[in-house]
Amino acid sequence: MISIVADLESITKLESGELKINLVNFDLVRLTEEVFELAQMLANERGISLQFATKTEKPIMVSADKKRIMEVMNNLVGNGIKYGKKRGFVKVGFYDLHETILIEITDNGIGMDKNDLFRIFERFYRVDKSRSREQGGTGLGLSIVKHIIEAHDQTINVKSVPDKGTTFTFTLGKAK
């Protein structure tokens, strides 16, 4: 119940523009390692590997609200685990687009039908009601993710194929 109230409070502030974005420079690789550390136990329980899709030998510095981007990454990696297949994967890749970094989170889970893709960022929308009930959650996570990315003046995109998996992509500005 507390989680639902916190999610509703977050999304209300995001939608109204009340939530301020606190831009700081941070290492996206390190933040993703922290997300993987937090998610590892659940991933192990479900037989899902957490991987980097690109080389991460050096820091990738971005300018963004670190707390909010941690929330975005936790949500997207968590969903990849939650809706993943046994012996599946969640991969995070980073791609340099000159002034921005493209972040790509891919899983080989249950995927979504193209008709659902238009609605997944809506409040309380759940693709598969029976599976969602089994997995828990508030139905607010992807709506919050979208608002956080938009508050950074960026967009989030999704591609998915049923029974093949899902890929979310968004960009963040490089640290100056």
For each predicted feature, which ranges?
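Conserved micro-motifs of the catalytic ATP-binding
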Residues: 16-21, 59-64
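Short conserved segment of the HATPase_c
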Residues: 112-126, 146
